[in-house]
Amino acid sequence: MTNNIHRPSRTALLLGFGGLIPFVGLSSLCIFTSGTHQQTLLFSLLAYGATIISFLGAIHWGLTMMESSPNSLRLVWGVIPSLAAWLSLIFNTQLGLAIQCLILWACFFVDLKTYPTFNLSAWLKMRFVLTLIASVSLFAPLAFNYIQ
């Protein structure tokens, strides 16, 4: 059996969508709790978001390693998401969650431009859905607390 990296495998789909469980679960719990428990859950959501954002940047290092002539700009971009995610942990939780929503979409738009270069356009549909659900999960507790 040949492994085609140009489109998501069943395993990639399962892991990608499985990775949404902490986003959706923590976000839902944040909405239905309050006080100290809610703050702990919000920070857990923020920490998980930072982890995923760091992974999204690291993908670009992997792509660059496949090139015969490494792209310096792609290497620089590869560390920007992790640095931005780290900064999001320094601010108050609500601001951090909003920043992470923006970072997730920035990562998606960079991928939208980068993936076709590597014949990986078939991954973009999954990336869009994952980004949409993850960003809504980060934003939902903010919106819910605002309307209360």
Which stretches of residues belong to each language-model region?
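Short juxtamembrane and helix-loop transition motifs at transmembrane-helix boundaries
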Residues: 3-7, 34-42, 55-69, 91-94, ...
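Core segments of alpha-helical transmembrane spans in multipass integral membrane proteins
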Residues: 17-24, 44-87
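Alpha-helical transmembrane segments and their membrane-interface exit regions
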Residues: 54, 102-114
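Interfacial loop-to-transmembrane junctions
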Residues: 113-135
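Juxtamembrane boundary at the C-terminal end of a transmembrane helix
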Residues: 140-148
